[in-house]
């Protein structure tokens, strides 16, 4: 488990040569569907760009706290930081 200010990443090694991601953005944390979907798109894009270093891992990313959509670069950067941590330690 890797954590940042607003995201949590669960990682499990798997015996395949690809990486997968699951996203949890609960309605309890972010009420508006438009904002939940925007956050998921940002995290998916970060995953797509860094998929090579996560080969052989199942990842689940969870939004821990509400965030402002104006902070989309911060969400993206936190996701990338967590992917980097996971790739280095596993």
What are these regions (language model features)?
Residues 1-90:
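Positively charged, solvent-exposed patches that mediate nucleic-acid binding
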């Amino acid at each position: 488990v890797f954590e940042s200010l607003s995201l949590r990443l669960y990682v499990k090694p798997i015996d395949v040569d690809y990486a997968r991601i699951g996203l949890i953005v609960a309605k309890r944390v972010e009420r508006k569907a438009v904002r939940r979907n925007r956050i998921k798109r940002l995290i998916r894009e970060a995953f797509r760009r860094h998929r090579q270093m996560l080969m052989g891992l199942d990842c689940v990313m969870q939004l821990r706290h509400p965030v402002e959509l104006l902070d989309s670069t911060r969400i993206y950067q936190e996701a990338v930081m967590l992917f980097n941590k996971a790739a280095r330690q596993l």
